[in-house]
Protein backbone atom coordinates (compact mmCIF):
# COMPACT_ATOMS: atom_id res chain seq x y z
CA UNK A 1 0.00 0.00 0.00
CA UNK A 2 1.64 3.24 -1.17
CA UNK A 3 1.00 6.85 -0.25
CA UNK A 4 0.37 9.63 -2.68
CA UNK A 5 3.54 11.52 -3.53
CA UNK A 6 2.38 14.60 -1.60
CA UNK A 7 2.03 12.59 1.58
CA UNK A 8 5.40 10.88 1.09
CA UNK A 9 7.12 14.24 0.82
CA UNK A 10 5.47 15.75 3.91
CA UNK A 11 7.89 15.92 6.82
CA UNK A 12 5.24 17.19 9.23
CA UNK A 13 3.37 13.88 9.34
CA UNK A 14 5.67 11.24 7.90
CA UNK A 15 9.16 9.91 7.42
CA UNK A 16 10.50 6.61 6.11
CA UNK A 17 9.79 4.83 9.43
CA UNK A 18 6.15 5.97 9.62
CA UNK A 19 4.88 5.25 6.09
CA UNK A 20 3.11 1.94 5.33
CA UNK A 21 5.41 -1.04 4.88
CA UNK A 22 5.55 -2.64 1.47
CA UNK A 23 4.63 -6.31 1.22
CA UNK A 24 8.27 -7.23 0.59
CA UNK A 25 9.13 -6.06 4.13
CA UNK A 26 6.32 -7.99 5.81
CA UNK A 27 8.29 -11.16 6.50
CA UNK A 28 7.55 -12.03 10.14
CA UNK A 29 6.02 -15.44 10.70
CA UNK A 30 4.31 -16.97 13.73
CA UNK A 31 7.67 -18.09 15.16
CA UNK A 32 8.95 -14.51 15.23
CA UNK A 33 5.97 -13.33 17.27
CA UNK A 34 6.13 -16.37 19.56
CA UNK A 35 9.84 -15.69 20.15
CA UNK A 36 9.12 -12.10 21.12
CA UNK A 37 6.73 -13.27 23.82
CA UNK A 38 9.10 -15.98 25.02
CA UNK A 39 11.71 -13.27 25.51
CA UNK A 40 9.37 -10.65 26.95
CA UNK A 41 7.67 -12.82 29.56
CA UNK A 42 10.82 -14.34 31.03
CA UNK A 43 12.25 -11.37 32.90
CA UNK A 44 12.92 -10.19 36.42
CA UNK A 45 10.00 -7.73 36.96
CA UNK A 46 7.49 -10.29 35.65
CA UNK A 47 8.88 -12.79 38.12
CA UNK A 48 8.63 -10.14 40.85
CA UNK A 49 4.99 -9.50 39.95
CA UNK A 50 4.09 -13.20 40.05
CA UNK A 51 6.12 -13.73 43.20
CA UNK A 52 4.45 -10.71 44.74
CA UNK A 53 1.07 -12.42 44.39
CA UNK A 54 2.37 -15.26 46.56
CA UNK A 55 3.82 -12.73 49.00
CA UNK A 56 0.46 -10.96 49.53
CA UNK A 57 -1.21 -14.22 50.54
CA UNK A 58 -2.64 -15.90 47.44
CA UNK A 59 -2.19 -19.65 47.14
CA UNK A 60 -0.06 -21.13 44.31
CA UNK A 61 -3.16 -22.45 42.53
CA UNK A 62 -4.90 -19.07 42.79
CA UNK A 63 -1.85 -17.35 41.30
CA UNK A 64 -1.69 -19.86 38.45
CA UNK A 65 -5.37 -19.18 37.68
CA UNK A 66 -4.67 -15.43 37.70
CA UNK A 67 -1.84 -15.84 35.19
CA UNK A 68 -3.87 -18.02 32.82
CA UNK A 69 -6.84 -15.62 32.97
CA UNK A 70 -4.65 -12.56 32.38
CA UNK A 71 -2.74 -14.18 29.50
CA UNK A 72 -5.94 -15.10 27.66
CA UNK A 73 -7.28 -11.54 28.04
CA UNK A 74 -3.92 -10.19 26.89
CA UNK A 75 -3.95 -12.44 23.84
CA UNK A 76 -7.39 -11.18 22.85
CA UNK A 77 -6.44 -7.51 23.32
CA UNK A 78 -3.17 -7.90 21.41
CA UNK A 79 -4.72 -9.80 18.51
CA UNK A 80 -7.47 -7.19 18.16
CA UNK A 81 -5.25 -4.14 18.47
CA UNK A 82 -2.65 -5.65 16.15
CA UNK A 83 -5.16 -6.17 13.32
CA UNK A 84 -4.76 -2.71 11.76
CA UNK A 85 -0.97 -2.97 11.86
CA UNK A 86 -1.02 -6.13 9.76
CA UNK A 87 -3.78 -4.99 7.41
CA UNK A 88 -2.25 -1.62 6.55
CA UNK A 89 1.44 -2.00 7.49
CA UNK A 90 1.15 1.00 9.83
CA UNK A 91 2.75 1.69 13.24
CA UNK A 92 0.75 2.64 16.33
CA UNK A 93 1.41 6.44 16.23
CA UNK A 94 -0.08 6.62 12.74
CA UNK A 95 -3.06 4.32 13.38
CA UNK A 96 -4.10 6.33 16.43
CA UNK A 97 -4.45 9.46 14.26
CA UNK A 98 -7.76 8.03 13.05
CA UNK A 99 -9.29 8.38 16.52
CA UNK A 100 -7.40 11.25 18.18
CA UNK A 101 -6.68 13.40 15.12
CA UNK A 102 -3.50 13.88 13.12
CA UNK A 103 -1.98 16.13 15.80
CA UNK A 104 -3.95 14.96 18.81
CA UNK A 105 -2.45 11.48 18.36
CA UNK A 106 0.85 12.83 19.67
CA UNK A 107 -0.60 13.18 23.18
CA UNK A 108 -1.57 9.54 23.88
CA UNK A 109 1.49 8.40 21.92
CA UNK A 110 3.81 10.44 24.14
CA UNK A 111 1.92 9.28 27.24
CA UNK A 112 2.54 5.72 26.15
CA UNK A 113 6.17 6.62 25.41
CA UNK A 114 6.60 8.05 28.92
CA UNK A 115 5.23 4.85 30.46
CA UNK A 116 7.48 2.68 28.31
CA UNK A 117 10.50 4.78 29.27
CA UNK A 118 9.64 4.29 32.95
CA UNK A 119 9.42 0.54 32.32
CA UNK A 120 12.72 0.67 30.47
CA UNK A 121 14.31 2.18 33.56
CA UNK A 122 12.73 -0.44 35.84
CA UNK A 123 13.77 -3.36 33.63
CA UNK A 124 17.28 -1.97 33.19
CA UNK A 125 17.69 -1.56 36.94
CA UNK A 126 16.39 -5.09 37.52
CA UNK A 127 18.93 -6.47 35.07
CA UNK A 128 21.69 -4.36 36.59
CA UNK A 129 21.04 -5.86 40.05
CA UNK A 130 21.76 -9.28 38.57
CA UNK A 131 24.88 -7.90 36.90
CA UNK A 132 25.93 -6.37 40.22
CA UNK A 133 25.78 -9.81 41.87
CA UNK A 134 28.00 -11.20 39.12
CA UNK A 135 30.55 -8.43 39.63
CA UNK A 136 30.52 -8.95 43.41
CA UNK A 137 31.32 -12.63 42.89
CA UNK A 138 34.07 -11.95 40.37
CA UNK A 139 35.52 -8.98 42.24
CA UNK A 140 34.79 -8.99 46.01
CA UNK A 141 35.94 -5.38 46.31
CA UNK A 142 33.28 -4.21 43.87
CA UNK A 143 30.82 -3.48 46.65
CA UNK A 144 33.34 -1.23 48.43
CA UNK A 145 33.68 1.20 45.56
CA UNK A 146 32.77 4.67 46.77
CA UNK A 147 32.69 3.60 50.43
CA UNK A 148 29.41 4.71 52.00
CA UNK A 149 28.63 7.16 49.23
CA UNK A 150 25.01 6.93 47.98
CA UNK A 151 23.46 8.79 45.08
CA UNK A 152 19.67 9.25 45.23
CA UNK A 153 19.38 6.19 47.44
CA UNK A 154 21.64 3.83 45.48
CA UNK A 155 25.22 2.78 46.22
CA UNK A 156 27.88 3.79 43.71
CA UNK A 157 28.58 0.18 42.68
CA UNK A 158 24.88 -0.34 41.97
CA UNK A 159 24.73 2.88 39.95
CA UNK A 160 27.75 1.86 37.89
CA UNK A 161 26.17 -1.53 37.20
CA UNK A 162 22.99 0.26 36.11
CA UNK A 163 24.85 2.53 33.68
CA UNK A 164 26.97 -0.32 32.30
CA UNK A 165 23.96 -2.56 31.73
CA UNK A 166 22.11 0.35 30.12
CA UNK A 167 25.00 0.84 27.69
CA UNK A 168 24.74 -2.78 26.48
CA UNK A 169 21.29 -1.99 25.05
CA UNK A 170 22.84 0.53 22.68
CA UNK A 171 24.68 -2.22 20.82
CA UNK A 172 21.42 -3.95 19.90
CA UNK A 173 19.71 -0.68 18.98
CA UNK A 174 22.50 0.26 16.62
CA UNK A 175 21.43 -2.43 14.13
CA UNK A 176 17.68 -1.65 13.95
CA UNK A 177 14.51 -3.77 13.74
CA UNK A 178 15.97 -6.75 11.86
CA UNK A 179 18.58 -7.27 14.58
CA UNK A 180 15.78 -7.15 17.13
CA UNK A 181 13.98 -9.95 15.27
CA UNK A 182 17.13 -12.11 15.20
CA UNK A 183 17.95 -11.36 18.84
CA UNK A 184 14.48 -12.39 20.02
CA UNK A 185 14.62 -15.77 18.23
CA UNK A 186 17.37 -17.14 20.50
CA UNK A 187 17.10 -14.92 23.60
CA UNK A 188 13.73 -16.26 24.82
CA UNK A 189 14.47 -20.01 24.78
CA UNK A 190 17.81 -19.45 26.51
CA UNK A 191 16.04 -18.18 29.62
CA UNK A 192 14.37 -21.57 30.10
CA UNK A 193 17.76 -22.93 31.17
CA UNK A 194 17.98 -20.71 34.23
CA UNK A 195 14.37 -20.95 35.34
CA UNK A 196 14.37 -24.69 34.70
CA UNK A 197 17.39 -25.01 36.99
CA UNK A 198 15.78 -22.87 39.66
CA UNK A 199 12.59 -24.96 39.52
CA UNK A 200 14.72 -28.08 40.01
CA UNK A 201 16.35 -26.44 43.04
CA UNK A 202 12.99 -25.36 44.52
CA UNK A 203 11.38 -28.79 44.08
CA UNK A 204 14.42 -30.50 45.57
CA UNK A 205 14.65 -28.24 48.61
CA UNK A 206 10.88 -28.39 49.25
CA UNK A 207 10.77 -32.18 48.95
CA UNK A 208 8.62 -32.27 45.81
CA UNK A 209 5.82 -30.29 44.22
CA UNK A 210 3.28 -31.46 46.81
CA UNK A 211 4.58 -29.31 49.71
CA UNK A 212 4.82 -26.30 47.38
CA UNK A 213 1.35 -26.43 45.84
CA UNK A 214 -0.39 -27.53 49.02
CA UNK A 215 0.51 -24.27 50.78
CA UNK A 216 -2.76 -22.50 51.62
CA UNK A 217 -3.46 -18.86 50.90
CA UNK A 218 -5.03 -16.47 53.34
CA UNK A 219 -8.08 -15.88 51.10
CA UNK A 220 -10.59 -18.73 51.31
CA UNK A 221 -14.13 -17.66 50.38
CA UNK A 222 -15.21 -16.25 47.01
CA UNK A 223 -15.85 -12.80 48.49
CA UNK A 224 -12.39 -12.76 50.09
CA UNK A 225 -10.65 -13.96 46.93
CA UNK A 226 -12.45 -12.01 44.19
CA UNK A 227 -10.83 -8.59 44.57
CA UNK A 228 -7.26 -9.83 45.16
CA UNK A 229 -7.78 -12.12 42.15
CA UNK A 230 -9.09 -9.28 39.97
CA UNK A 231 -6.32 -6.95 41.16
CA UNK A 232 -3.76 -9.63 40.32
CA UNK A 233 -5.13 -10.01 36.79
CA UNK A 234 -5.05 -6.22 36.40
CA UNK A 235 -1.47 -6.10 37.66
CA UNK A 236 -0.33 -8.70 35.14
CA UNK A 237 -2.09 -6.86 32.31
CA UNK A 238 -0.57 -3.61 33.58
CA UNK A 239 2.88 -4.99 32.82
CA UNK A 240 1.92 -5.22 29.15
CA UNK A 241 -0.40 -2.20 28.91
CA UNK A 242 2.13 -0.36 26.74
CA UNK A 243 2.60 -3.32 24.39
CA UNK A 244 -1.17 -3.69 23.96
CA UNK A 245 -1.14 -0.21 22.44
CA UNK A 246 1.98 -0.48 20.33
CA UNK A 247 1.56 -4.06 19.11
CA UNK A 248 0.93 -2.65 15.57
CA UNK A 249 4.60 -1.60 15.61
CA UNK A 250 5.33 -5.34 15.36
CA UNK A 251 2.29 -6.76 13.57
CA UNK A 252 2.95 -4.41 10.64
CA UNK A 253 5.83 -6.76 9.81
CA UNK A 254 3.58 -9.87 9.75
CA UNK A 255 3.05 -11.75 6.48
CA UNK A 256 -0.66 -12.26 7.27
CA UNK A 257 -3.20 -11.82 10.07
CA UNK A 258 -3.04 -15.57 10.62
CA UNK A 259 0.71 -15.43 11.31
CA UNK A 260 0.47 -12.68 13.94
CA UNK A 261 -2.53 -14.28 15.67
CA UNK A 262 -0.98 -17.77 15.71
CA UNK A 263 2.36 -16.42 16.88
CA UNK A 264 0.84 -14.49 19.75
CA UNK A 265 -1.28 -17.45 20.81
CA UNK A 266 1.68 -19.84 20.77
CA UNK A 267 3.94 -17.37 22.51
CA UNK A 268 1.62 -15.90 25.14
CA UNK A 269 -0.88 -18.13 27.02
CA UNK A 270 1.24 -21.29 26.98
CA UNK A 271 4.55 -19.58 27.66
CA UNK A 272 3.04 -17.40 30.38
CA UNK A 273 1.49 -20.41 32.12
CA UNK A 274 4.84 -22.23 32.03
CA UNK A 275 6.62 -19.18 33.38
CA UNK A 276 3.99 -18.79 36.09
CA UNK A 277 4.56 -22.39 37.13
CA UNK A 278 8.30 -21.69 37.39
CA UNK A 279 7.82 -18.41 39.29
CA UNK A 280 5.32 -19.89 41.73
CA UNK A 281 7.48 -22.94 42.34
CA UNK A 282 10.64 -20.93 42.96
CA UNK A 283 8.92 -18.33 45.19
CA UNK A 284 7.19 -21.02 47.25
CA UNK A 285 10.43 -23.01 47.36
CA UNK A 286 12.21 -19.95 48.74
CA UNK A 287 9.65 -19.86 51.55
CA UNK A 288 10.59 -23.43 52.46
CA UNK A 289 14.32 -22.76 52.10
CA UNK A 290 14.60 -19.35 53.76
CA UNK A 291 11.45 -19.06 55.89
CA UNK A 292 9.87 -16.31 53.79
CA UNK A 293 8.68 -15.97 50.18
CA UNK A 294 11.28 -14.04 48.18
CA UNK A 295 9.55 -12.21 45.34
CA UNK A 296 12.76 -10.98 43.66
CA UNK A 297 14.63 -13.69 41.74
CA UNK A 298 17.88 -11.73 42.06
CA UNK A 299 17.66 -11.97 45.87
CA UNK A 300 17.40 -15.75 45.53
CA UNK A 301 20.45 -15.88 43.26
CA UNK A 302 22.38 -13.79 45.77
CA UNK A 303 21.92 -16.57 48.35
CA UNK A 304 23.48 -19.26 46.16
CA UNK A 305 27.11 -20.14 46.84
CA UNK A 306 27.99 -21.85 43.54
CA UNK A 307 29.84 -19.32 41.35
CA UNK A 308 29.14 -21.25 38.12
CA UNK A 309 25.40 -21.22 38.80
CA UNK A 310 25.52 -17.50 39.54
CA UNK A 311 27.48 -16.67 36.36
CA UNK A 312 25.19 -18.68 34.05
CA UNK A 313 22.04 -17.41 35.74
CA UNK A 314 23.06 -13.76 35.70
CA UNK A 315 24.14 -13.79 32.06
CA UNK A 316 20.86 -15.40 31.02
CA UNK A 317 18.75 -13.01 33.10
CA UNK A 318 20.60 -10.07 31.59
CA UNK A 319 19.91 -11.37 28.08
CA UNK A 320 16.24 -11.84 28.98
CA UNK A 321 16.01 -8.30 30.33
CA UNK A 322 17.58 -6.80 27.22
CA UNK A 323 15.16 -8.87 25.15
CA UNK A 324 12.04 -7.48 26.82
CA UNK A 325 13.44 -3.96 26.99
CA UNK A 326 14.15 -3.74 23.29
CA UNK A 327 10.84 -5.30 22.23
CA UNK A 328 8.46 -3.73 24.75
CA UNK A 329 10.11 -0.57 26.04
CA UNK A 330 12.31 0.87 23.29
CA UNK A 331 10.57 0.16 19.99
CA UNK A 332 7.31 1.81 21.11
CA UNK A 333 8.60 5.17 22.41
CA UNK A 334 11.09 5.34 19.53
CA UNK A 335 8.19 5.38 17.05
CA UNK A 336 6.25 7.80 19.27
CA UNK A 337 9.10 10.29 19.49
CA UNK A 338 9.69 9.99 15.74
CA UNK A 339 5.98 10.62 15.18
CA UNK A 340 6.11 13.83 17.24
CA UNK A 341 9.02 15.28 15.22
CA UNK A 342 9.27 13.23 12.02
CA UNK A 343 11.27 15.92 10.22
CA UNK A 344 14.16 15.59 12.66
CA UNK A 345 13.85 12.17 14.30
CA UNK A 346 13.74 8.73 12.70
CA UNK A 347 13.31 5.37 14.44
CA UNK A 348 16.99 4.92 15.31
CA UNK A 349 17.34 8.43 16.76
CA UNK A 350 14.13 7.90 18.72
CA UNK A 351 15.59 4.68 20.13
CA UNK A 352 18.67 6.42 21.46
CA UNK A 353 16.64 9.31 22.89
CA UNK A 354 14.44 6.74 24.67
CA UNK A 355 17.47 4.99 26.13
CA UNK A 356 18.94 8.30 27.29
CA UNK A 357 15.74 9.36 29.07
CA UNK A 358 15.57 6.02 30.90
CA UNK A 359 18.75 6.95 32.76
CA UNK A 360 16.82 9.57 34.74
CA UNK A 361 13.82 7.49 35.92
CA UNK A 362 15.25 6.54 39.38
CA UNK A 363 13.78 3.01 39.03
CA UNK A 364 15.27 1.60 42.24
CA UNK A 365 12.63 3.53 44.18
CA UNK A 366 9.81 1.73 42.35
CA UNK A 367 11.40 -1.69 42.93
CA UNK A 368 11.73 -1.29 46.71
CA UNK A 369 8.76 -3.57 47.48
CA UNK A 370 5.93 -5.57 45.94
CA UNK A 371 3.51 -2.84 47.11
CA UNK A 372 5.28 -0.09 45.18
CA UNK A 373 5.40 -2.26 42.06
CA UNK A 374 1.64 -2.89 42.18
CA UNK A 375 0.90 0.80 42.79
CA UNK A 376 2.85 1.65 39.65
CA UNK A 377 1.11 -1.07 37.63
CA UNK A 378 -2.31 0.16 38.73
CA UNK A 379 -1.43 3.68 37.65
CA UNK A 380 -0.26 2.43 34.25
CA UNK A 381 -3.44 0.46 33.72
CA UNK A 382 -5.59 3.44 34.60
CA UNK A 383 -3.78 5.73 32.16
CA UNK A 384 -3.31 3.42 29.17
CA UNK A 385 -6.46 1.31 29.41
CA UNK A 386 -8.68 4.20 28.22
CA UNK A 387 -6.45 4.75 25.18
CA UNK A 388 -6.82 1.08 24.22
CA UNK A 389 -10.59 1.37 24.66
CA UNK A 390 -10.78 4.35 22.30
CA UNK A 391 -8.55 2.64 19.71
CA UNK A 392 -10.64 -0.54 19.60
CA UNK A 393 -13.96 1.32 19.58
CA UNK A 394 -12.82 3.53 16.72
CA UNK A 395 -11.32 0.78 14.55
CA UNK A 396 -13.84 -2.01 15.05
CA UNK A 397 -17.11 -0.20 15.79
CA UNK A 398 -16.88 3.24 14.20
CA UNK A 399 -14.60 2.53 11.19
CA UNK A 400 -15.52 -1.15 10.80
CA UNK A 401 -11.84 -1.97 10.15
CA UNK A 402 -11.58 0.47 7.22
CA UNK A 403 -9.05 3.32 7.29
CA UNK A 404 -8.15 5.89 4.65
CA UNK A 405 -4.37 5.57 4.67
CA UNK A 406 -3.69 8.72 2.64
CA UNK A 407 -5.79 10.81 5.04
CA UNK A 408 -3.70 9.61 8.00
CA UNK A 409 -0.83 11.65 6.51
CA UNK A 410 -2.91 14.57 5.24
CA UNK A 411 -3.42 17.97 6.88
CA UNK A 412 -6.69 18.40 4.97
CA UNK A 413 -8.14 14.88 5.22
CA UNK A 414 -10.92 13.28 7.23
CA UNK A 415 -8.83 12.81 10.40
CA UNK A 416 -8.14 16.51 10.92
CA UNK A 417 -11.34 17.00 12.99
CA UNK A 418 -10.90 20.35 14.79
CA UNK A 419 -7.42 21.70 14.06
CA UNK A 420 -6.04 18.17 14.15
CA UNK A 421 -7.72 17.11 17.42
CA UNK A 422 -10.76 14.91 18.05
CA UNK A 423 -12.28 16.11 21.32
CA UNK A 424 -14.45 12.98 21.55
CA UNK A 425 -11.43 10.72 21.94
CA UNK A 426 -9.91 12.95 24.61
CA UNK A 427 -13.18 13.25 26.53
CA UNK A 428 -13.60 9.46 26.54
CA UNK A 429 -9.98 8.96 27.60
CA UNK A 430 -10.16 11.45 30.45
CA UNK A 431 -13.44 10.03 31.75
CA UNK A 432 -12.05 6.49 31.66
CA UNK A 433 -8.86 7.54 33.44
CA UNK A 434 -10.76 9.58 36.05
CA UNK A 435 -13.11 6.76 37.00
CA UNK A 436 -10.40 4.10 37.01
CA UNK A 437 -7.93 6.11 39.10
CA UNK A 438 -10.28 7.90 41.50
CA UNK A 439 -9.93 5.01 43.93
CA UNK A 440 -6.37 6.15 44.65
CA UNK A 441 -7.84 9.09 46.56
CA UNK A 442 -11.36 7.93 47.51
CA UNK A 443 -11.10 4.84 49.74
CA UNK A 444 -14.69 3.74 49.15
CA UNK A 445 -13.91 3.45 45.42
CA UNK A 446 -10.61 1.60 45.82
CA UNK A 447 -12.11 -1.46 44.12
CA UNK A 448 -12.27 0.51 40.85
CA UNK A 449 -8.56 1.27 41.13
CA UNK A 450 -7.80 -2.40 41.78
CA UNK A 451 -9.20 -3.22 38.32
CA UNK A 452 -8.15 0.06 36.71
CA UNK A 453 -7.28 -1.32 33.27
CA UNK A 454 -10.67 -2.98 32.80
CA UNK A 455 -12.57 0.06 34.06
CA UNK A 456 -10.59 2.40 31.82
CA UNK A 457 -11.07 0.26 28.70
CA UNK A 458 -14.80 -0.25 29.24
CA UNK A 459 -15.68 3.37 30.10
CA UNK A 460 -13.68 4.91 27.26
CA UNK A 461 -14.89 2.28 24.76
CA UNK A 462 -18.56 2.96 25.47
CA UNK A 463 -18.31 6.74 25.92
CA UNK A 464 -16.35 7.19 22.68
CA UNK A 465 -19.00 5.31 20.71
CA UNK A 466 -21.73 7.44 22.28
CA UNK A 467 -19.94 10.70 21.46
CA UNK A 468 -19.21 9.65 17.88
CA UNK A 469 -22.88 8.70 17.38
CA UNK A 470 -24.45 11.68 19.15
CA UNK A 471 -22.13 14.34 17.71
CA UNK A 472 -20.32 12.72 14.77
CA UNK A 473 -17.65 14.60 12.81
CA UNK A 474 -18.65 15.57 9.27
CA UNK A 475 -16.07 13.21 7.80
CA UNK A 476 -17.79 10.21 9.40
CA UNK A 477 -20.84 10.64 7.17
CA UNK A 478 -18.57 10.38 4.13
CA UNK A 479 -17.02 7.19 5.48
CA UNK A 480 -20.45 5.70 6.16
CA UNK A 481 -21.45 6.26 2.53
CA UNK A 482 -18.15 4.80 1.29
CA UNK A 483 -18.57 1.69 3.45
CA UNK A 484 -22.11 1.20 2.13
CA UNK A 485 -20.88 1.47 -1.46
CA UNK A 486 -18.12 -1.07 -0.81
CA UNK A 487 -20.60 -3.53 0.70
CA UNK A 488 -22.95 -3.12 -2.27
CA UNK A 489 -20.08 -3.70 -4.70
CA UNK A 490 -19.17 -6.91 -2.88
Swiss-Prot record:
Induction / repression: Expression is very low in excess nitrogen (glutamate plus ammonia) and is induced during limiting-nitrogen conditions (glutamate). Expression is further induced when allantoin or allantoate are added during limiting-nitrogen conditions.
Record-level GO BP terms: nucleobase transport
Compartments reported by the entry: Cell membrane
Primary localisation category: membrane
GO cellular component, one term: plasma membrane
Catalysed reactions listed for this entry: (S)-allantoin(in) + H(+)(in) = (S)-allantoin(out) + H(+)(out)
Family: Belongs to the purine-cytosine permease (2.A.39) family.
Protein name: Allantoin permease
Organism ancestry: Bacteria, Bacillati, Bacillota, Bacilli, Bacillales
Gene name of this polypeptide: pucI
Amino acid sequence: MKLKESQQQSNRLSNEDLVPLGQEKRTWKAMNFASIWMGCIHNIPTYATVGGLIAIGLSPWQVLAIIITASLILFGALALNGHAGTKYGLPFPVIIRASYGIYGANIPALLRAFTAIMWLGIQTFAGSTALNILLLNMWPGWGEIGGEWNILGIHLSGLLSFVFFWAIHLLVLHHGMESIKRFEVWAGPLVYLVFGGMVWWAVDIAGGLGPIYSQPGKFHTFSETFWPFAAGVTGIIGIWATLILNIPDFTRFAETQKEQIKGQFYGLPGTFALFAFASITVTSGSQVAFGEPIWDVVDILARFDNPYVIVLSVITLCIATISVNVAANIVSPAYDIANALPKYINFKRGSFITALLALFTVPWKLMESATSVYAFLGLIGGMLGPVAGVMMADYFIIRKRELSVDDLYSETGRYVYWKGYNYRAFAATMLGALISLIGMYVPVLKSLYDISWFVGVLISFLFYIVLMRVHPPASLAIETVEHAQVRQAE
